[in-house]
Regions:
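C-terminal and inter-domain tail/linker signature
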Residues: 1-258
Length: 258
Protein backbone atom coordinates (compact mmCIF):
# COMPACT_ATOMS: atom_id res chain seq x y z
CA UNK A 1 0.00 0.00 0.00
CA UNK A 2 1.43 3.36 -1.03
CA UNK A 3 2.23 5.73 1.83
CA UNK A 4 0.73 9.19 1.46
CA UNK A 5 3.17 12.07 1.94
CA UNK A 6 1.10 14.05 4.43
CA UNK A 7 3.71 16.75 5.01
CA UNK A 8 4.15 17.18 1.27
CA UNK A 9 0.40 17.37 0.70
CA UNK A 10 -0.04 19.93 3.49
CA UNK A 11 2.70 22.10 2.04
CA UNK A 12 1.39 21.75 -1.51
CA UNK A 13 -2.07 22.66 -0.26
CA UNK A 14 -0.78 25.86 1.32
CA UNK A 15 1.21 26.73 -1.79
CA UNK A 16 -1.89 26.31 -3.94
CA UNK A 17 -3.09 29.50 -2.25
CA UNK A 18 0.15 31.48 -1.97
CA UNK A 19 2.31 30.34 -4.88
CA UNK A 20 0.00 29.01 -7.60
CA UNK A 21 -3.08 31.07 -6.58
CA UNK A 22 -5.06 28.17 -8.01
CA UNK A 23 -8.49 27.30 -6.59
CA UNK A 24 -8.76 24.03 -8.50
CA UNK A 25 -5.38 22.93 -7.18
CA UNK A 26 -6.39 23.85 -3.63
CA UNK A 27 -9.46 21.61 -3.96
CA UNK A 28 -7.11 18.64 -4.44
CA UNK A 29 -5.61 19.13 -0.97
CA UNK A 30 -8.44 20.57 1.17
CA UNK A 31 -11.73 18.83 1.90
CA UNK A 32 -14.70 20.99 0.96
CA UNK A 33 -16.11 20.84 4.50
CA UNK A 34 -12.82 20.99 6.38
CA UNK A 35 -13.19 22.08 9.99
CA UNK A 36 -11.85 25.59 10.52
CA UNK A 37 -10.69 26.76 13.96
CA UNK A 38 -9.34 30.16 12.88
CA UNK A 39 -11.78 32.51 14.63
CA UNK A 40 -11.77 34.94 11.72
CA UNK A 41 -12.63 32.44 8.98
CA UNK A 42 -15.98 30.75 8.32
CA UNK A 43 -16.31 26.98 8.21
CA UNK A 44 -15.32 25.14 5.03
CA UNK A 45 -13.21 25.70 1.94
CA UNK A 46 -15.41 28.21 0.09
CA UNK A 47 -14.26 31.22 2.12
CA UNK A 48 -10.59 30.35 1.70
CA UNK A 49 -11.03 30.04 -2.06
CA UNK A 50 -12.58 33.51 -2.14
CA UNK A 51 -9.33 34.86 -0.68
CA UNK A 52 -7.21 33.67 -3.61
CA UNK A 53 -7.82 36.64 -5.97
CA UNK A 54 -7.03 39.07 -3.13
CA UNK A 55 -3.83 37.19 -2.28
CA UNK A 56 -2.78 37.13 -5.92
CA UNK A 57 -3.40 40.85 -6.32
CA UNK A 58 -1.43 41.63 -3.16
CA UNK A 59 1.39 39.25 -4.10
CA UNK A 60 0.91 37.35 -0.85
CA UNK A 61 3.53 34.63 -0.37
CA UNK A 62 4.35 32.13 2.34
CA UNK A 63 7.54 30.39 3.40
CA UNK A 64 7.63 27.26 5.53
CA UNK A 65 10.49 27.33 8.02
CA UNK A 66 9.70 24.16 9.98
CA UNK A 67 7.45 21.20 9.32
CA UNK A 68 6.89 18.01 11.27
CA UNK A 69 4.28 15.29 11.63
CA UNK A 70 2.56 13.60 14.57
CA UNK A 71 0.34 10.81 13.25
CA UNK A 72 -2.30 12.45 11.06
CA UNK A 73 -1.29 15.94 12.27
CA UNK A 74 1.09 18.15 10.27
CA UNK A 75 2.59 21.20 12.00
CA UNK A 76 4.02 24.05 9.92
CA UNK A 77 5.86 27.16 11.11
CA UNK A 78 5.29 29.71 8.36
CA UNK A 79 5.77 33.34 7.50
CA UNK A 80 3.37 35.35 5.34
CA UNK A 81 4.63 38.32 3.32
CA UNK A 82 2.62 40.98 1.48
CA UNK A 83 -0.17 40.01 3.82
CA UNK A 84 -2.68 42.82 3.24
CA UNK A 85 -5.57 40.33 2.81
CA UNK A 86 -4.82 39.19 6.37
CA UNK A 87 -4.73 42.71 7.77
CA UNK A 88 -1.03 43.53 7.91
CA UNK A 89 2.33 43.64 6.16
CA UNK A 90 3.78 40.34 7.33
CA UNK A 91 2.93 37.64 9.85
CA UNK A 92 4.40 34.61 11.55
CA UNK A 93 1.96 31.72 11.83
CA UNK A 94 1.72 28.21 13.16
CA UNK A 95 -0.55 26.20 10.86
CA UNK A 96 -1.71 22.82 12.13
CA UNK A 97 -3.51 20.46 9.76
CA UNK A 98 -5.29 17.21 10.51
CA UNK A 99 -5.05 15.09 7.40
CA UNK A 100 -7.64 12.60 6.21
CA UNK A 101 -7.27 10.57 3.00
CA UNK A 102 -4.26 12.73 2.16
CA UNK A 103 -6.28 15.96 2.39
CA UNK A 104 -6.66 18.69 4.99
CA UNK A 105 -9.74 17.88 7.08
CA UNK A 106 -9.17 20.27 9.99
CA UNK A 107 -7.10 23.41 10.62
CA UNK A 108 -5.89 25.25 13.70
CA UNK A 109 -3.59 28.26 13.66
CA UNK A 110 -2.12 31.15 15.58
CA UNK A 111 -0.57 34.22 13.98
CA UNK A 112 1.18 37.37 15.04
CA UNK A 113 2.74 40.32 13.20
CA UNK A 114 6.38 39.94 12.22
CA UNK A 115 8.52 42.44 14.14
CA UNK A 116 12.17 43.40 14.23
CA UNK A 117 14.15 41.32 16.75
CA UNK A 118 15.25 43.07 19.92
CA UNK A 119 17.91 40.55 20.94
CA UNK A 120 19.29 39.14 17.68
CA UNK A 121 17.02 36.16 17.01
CA UNK A 122 14.08 36.57 14.67
CA UNK A 123 10.68 34.94 15.16
CA UNK A 124 11.43 32.39 12.44
CA UNK A 125 15.16 31.66 12.28
CA UNK A 126 16.92 28.84 14.12
CA UNK A 127 17.19 25.08 13.81
CA UNK A 128 14.91 23.30 11.34
CA UNK A 129 16.03 19.66 11.12
CA UNK A 130 13.82 17.05 12.76
CA UNK A 131 16.06 14.61 14.67
CA UNK A 132 15.86 12.14 17.58
CA UNK A 133 12.75 10.39 16.31
CA UNK A 134 13.06 7.81 19.07
CA UNK A 135 12.59 10.60 21.66
CA UNK A 136 9.21 11.82 20.39
CA UNK A 137 7.03 10.54 23.22
CA UNK A 138 9.56 11.50 25.89
CA UNK A 139 9.83 15.03 24.56
CA UNK A 140 6.06 15.43 24.27
CA UNK A 141 5.65 14.37 27.89
CA UNK A 142 8.41 16.77 28.98
CA UNK A 143 6.79 19.64 27.07
CA UNK A 144 3.44 18.93 28.71
CA UNK A 145 5.01 18.91 32.17
CA UNK A 146 7.09 22.02 31.46
CA UNK A 147 4.04 24.01 30.41
CA UNK A 148 2.06 22.79 33.42
CA UNK A 149 4.79 23.46 35.98
CA UNK A 150 6.23 26.67 34.56
CA UNK A 151 3.35 28.41 32.81
CA UNK A 152 0.15 27.11 34.40
CA UNK A 153 1.39 26.75 37.98
CA UNK A 154 4.18 29.35 37.86
CA UNK A 155 6.75 27.08 39.51
CA UNK A 156 9.82 28.97 38.34
CA UNK A 157 11.98 26.93 40.73
CA UNK A 158 11.44 23.88 38.47
CA UNK A 159 12.94 25.61 35.41
CA UNK A 160 16.22 23.67 35.50
CA UNK A 161 14.27 20.42 35.16
CA UNK A 162 13.14 21.49 31.69
CA UNK A 163 15.27 24.36 30.36
CA UNK A 164 18.90 23.83 29.41
CA UNK A 165 21.27 25.87 31.55
CA UNK A 166 23.99 25.56 28.88
CA UNK A 167 22.04 26.74 25.82
CA UNK A 168 18.60 28.30 25.56
CA UNK A 169 17.84 30.16 22.31
CA UNK A 170 14.86 32.48 22.63
CA UNK A 171 12.89 33.67 19.59
CA UNK A 172 10.26 35.68 21.44
CA UNK A 173 11.34 39.19 20.38
CA UNK A 174 10.81 40.58 23.89
CA UNK A 175 13.36 38.40 25.67
CA UNK A 176 17.08 37.54 25.35
CA UNK A 177 18.71 34.12 25.20
CA UNK A 178 19.79 32.08 28.17
CA UNK A 179 18.48 30.19 31.17
CA UNK A 180 18.95 33.11 33.55
CA UNK A 181 17.04 35.40 31.20
CA UNK A 182 14.17 32.89 31.08
CA UNK A 183 13.94 32.74 34.87
CA UNK A 184 14.13 36.53 35.12
CA UNK A 185 11.37 36.93 32.53
CA UNK A 186 9.13 34.50 34.40
CA UNK A 187 9.67 36.33 37.67
CA UNK A 188 9.04 39.70 36.02
CA UNK A 189 5.79 38.51 34.45
CA UNK A 190 4.54 37.21 37.79
CA UNK A 191 5.07 40.61 39.43
CA UNK A 192 4.35 43.02 36.57
CA UNK A 193 1.61 41.08 34.74
CA UNK A 194 -0.38 39.44 37.56
CA UNK A 195 -3.53 39.31 35.42
CA UNK A 196 -1.87 37.19 32.72
CA UNK A 197 -2.74 33.54 33.28
CA UNK A 198 -1.90 30.39 31.33
CA UNK A 199 -5.12 28.43 31.78
CA UNK A 200 -4.67 25.10 30.03
CA UNK A 201 -2.68 23.19 27.41
CA UNK A 202 -5.18 21.79 24.90
CA UNK A 203 -2.90 20.00 22.41
CA UNK A 204 0.63 18.60 22.37
CA UNK A 205 1.98 17.67 18.92
CA UNK A 206 5.53 16.54 18.31
CA UNK A 207 8.04 14.68 16.21
CA UNK A 208 11.53 13.96 17.47
CA UNK A 209 13.17 17.06 18.87
CA UNK A 210 10.27 19.43 18.06
CA UNK A 211 7.11 19.76 20.17
CA UNK A 212 4.30 22.30 19.74
CA UNK A 213 1.96 22.96 22.67
CA UNK A 214 -1.31 24.76 21.88
CA UNK A 215 -2.67 26.39 25.00
CA UNK A 216 -5.22 28.84 26.32
CA UNK A 217 -4.46 31.93 28.34
CA UNK A 218 -6.21 34.96 29.75
CA UNK A 219 -4.88 38.48 30.03
CA UNK A 220 -7.02 40.71 32.24
CA UNK A 221 -10.23 39.15 30.95
CA UNK A 222 -9.16 38.70 27.32
CA UNK A 223 -8.89 35.08 26.22
CA UNK A 224 -5.64 34.22 24.42
CA UNK A 225 -4.32 31.55 22.08
CA UNK A 226 -0.78 30.56 23.16
CA UNK A 227 1.38 28.37 20.92
CA UNK A 228 4.83 27.35 22.21
CA UNK A 229 7.25 25.47 19.96
CA UNK A 230 10.11 23.79 21.81
CA UNK A 231 13.25 22.15 20.45
CA UNK A 232 14.71 19.53 22.76
CA UNK A 233 18.22 18.17 23.05
CA UNK A 234 19.06 15.40 25.51
CA UNK A 235 15.88 15.90 27.49
CA UNK A 236 16.11 19.69 27.87
CA UNK A 237 14.56 22.60 25.98
CA UNK A 238 17.29 24.39 24.04
CA UNK A 239 15.22 26.60 21.71
CA UNK A 240 11.81 28.26 21.87
CA UNK A 241 9.44 30.04 19.50
CA UNK A 242 5.97 31.27 20.44
CA UNK A 243 2.86 33.13 19.34
CA UNK A 244 0.31 34.75 21.65
CA UNK A 245 -2.90 35.88 19.94
CA UNK A 246 -6.04 37.43 21.45
CA UNK A 247 -9.25 35.50 20.79
CA UNK A 248 -11.96 37.82 19.42
CA UNK A 249 -15.31 37.90 21.17
CA UNK A 250 -17.10 37.53 17.81
CA UNK A 251 -16.06 34.47 15.82
CA UNK A 252 -16.75 33.51 12.21
CA UNK A 253 -17.37 29.84 13.03
CA UNK A 254 -18.68 27.76 15.92
CA UNK A 255 -15.79 25.27 16.11
CA UNK A 256 -13.80 26.93 18.89
CA UNK A 257 -10.15 27.89 18.53
CA UNK A 258 -8.88 24.65 20.10
Amino acid sequence: METIDLKGNAQRGLEAFTVAYDAELAKQYFKEDYIQHNPGAPQGLAYSLQMIPMMKEAGTTTETHRIFQDGDIVVMHNSILNAAPFGGDSFVVFDVYRMEDGMVAEHWDALTPMVEPSFGNSQIDGATEVTDLDQTERNKALAQRAVTDLFVNGKVETASQYISEEQYIQHNPMFPDGFDAFVSAMETMKTQMPDFKYVKAHHVWGEGNFVLVAGEGNNNGTAMIIYDLFRFDDGKIVEHWDIIQPIPAEKANDNGVF
